């Protein structure tokens, strides 16, 4: 099991990144909440990781904080929740926000996530109710080496990356494109575009 990786951020293509660890490039899929906090390409970063072994692939998932990884592991234990849906949930809601949803049994927040209908949201909240106290108590012990602003990206490239990331989360291409195009602010990074688009679609 690969539990943690520390290396140079070689590539950042939402929702994937490549981490160069002593000359070996590890492709890692991350939730948007982790993507927002990544340093510049070329800088050092540490990620808490979870490895999923399948017959046809070994898949690595990375997280900014250790408690995010623990939440991911709990989510994929739930009936009908695989890594894709777990990442979508964690991309739409911060850990503390998800805990509050469970406390309040708030289905509306979950149904805004692609692939989560009302019945699924109700079931997830019931199953999560007994676990949120443990998550709430998990310490946030992980800190990135650098948390500076994102590097400037070409506008067309940033918008394209943002649309691709939203599609990977389950949004329809037309929805993703419309949400990104609706953002009036200029010269935003792909991470900022994704964040604003998700809020707009919420």
Curated annotation (Swiss-Prot):
Region span, Domain II = 65-143
- Record region (Flexible linker): 144-153
An annotated GO cellular component: cytoplasm
Keyword annotations for this protein, in alphabetical order, are: Cytoplasm, DNA damage, DNA recombination, DNA repair, DNA-binding
Xref: SMART domains: HhH1
Output the SUPFAM superfamilies linked to this UniProt entry: DNA helicase RuvA subunit, C-terminal domain, Nucleic acid-binding proteins, RuvA domain 2-like
GO aspect biological process, one term? DNA recombination
Residue ranges for the region (Domain I) are 1-64
Q: Where is this region: Domain III?
A: 154-202
What InterPro entries does the record tag this protein with? DNA_helicase_Holl-junc_RuvA_I, Hlx-hairpin-Hlx_DNA-bd_motif, NA-bd_OB-fold, RuvA, RuvA_2-like, RuvA_C, RuvA_C_sf
Q: What is its main location?
A: cytoplasm
Any one GO molecular function term: four-way junction DNA binding
Q: Which Gene3D superfamilies match?
A: 5' to 3' exonuclease, C-terminal subdomain, DNA helicase RuvA subunit, C-terminal domain, Nucleic acid-binding proteins
Q: Where in the cell is it found?
A: Cytoplasm
Q: Which domain of life is it from?
A: Bacteria
What does this protein's UniProt record list under function?
Answer: The RuvA-RuvB-RuvC complex processes Holliday junction (HJ) DNA during genetic recombination and DNA repair, while the RuvA-RuvB complex plays an important role in the rescue of blocked DNA replication forks via replication fork reversal (RFR). RuvA specifically binds to HJ cruciform DNA, conferring on it an open structure. The RuvB hexamer acts as an ATP-dependent pump, pulling dsDNA into and through the RuvAB complex. HJ branch migration allows RuvC to scan DNA until it finds its consensus sequence, where it cleaves and resolves the cruciform DNA.
Q: How does it assemble?
A: Homotetramer. Forms an RuvA(8)-RuvB(12)-Holliday junction (HJ) complex. HJ DNA is sandwiched between 2 RuvA tetramers; dsDNA enters through RuvA and exits via RuvB. An RuvB hexamer assembles on each DNA strand where it exits the tetramer. Each RuvB hexamer is contacted by two RuvA subunits (via domain III) on 2 adjacent RuvB subunits; this complex drives branch migration. In the full resolvosome a probable DNA-RuvA(4)-RuvB(12)-RuvC(2) complex forms which resolves the HJ.
What protein family does this chain belong to? Belongs to the RuvA family.
Q: What is known of its domains?
A: Has three domains with a flexible linker between the domains II and III and assumes an 'L' shape. Domain III is highly mobile and contacts RuvB.
Q: What is this protein called?
A: Holliday junction branch migration complex subunit RuvA
Gene behind this protein: ruvA
């Amino acid at each position: 099991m690969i539990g943690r990786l520390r290396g140079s951020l070689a590539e950042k293509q939402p929702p994937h990144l490549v981490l160069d660890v002593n000359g070996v490039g590890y492709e890692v899929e991350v939730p948007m909440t982790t993507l927002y906090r990544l340093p510049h390409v070329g800088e050092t970063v540490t990620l808490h990781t979870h490895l999923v072994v399948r017959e046809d692939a070994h898949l690595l998932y990375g997280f900014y904080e250790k408690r995010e990884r623990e939440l991911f592991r709990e989510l994929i234990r739930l009936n009908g929740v695989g890594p894709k849906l777990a990442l979508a949930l964690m991309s739409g809601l911060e850990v503390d926000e998800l805990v509050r949803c469970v406390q309040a049994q708030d289905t509306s927040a979950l149904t805004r996530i692609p692939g989560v209908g009302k019945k699924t949201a109700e079931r997830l909240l019931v199953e999560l109710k007994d676990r949120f106290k443990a998550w709430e108590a998990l310490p946030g012990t992980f800190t990135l080496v650098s948390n500076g602003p994102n590097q400037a990206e070409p506008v067309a490239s940033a918008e394209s990356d943002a649309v691709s990331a939203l599609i990977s989360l389950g949004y329809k291409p037309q929805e993703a494109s419309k949400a990104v195009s609706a953002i009036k602010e200029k010269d935003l990074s792909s991470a900022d575009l994704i964040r604003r688009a998700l809020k707009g679609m919420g």
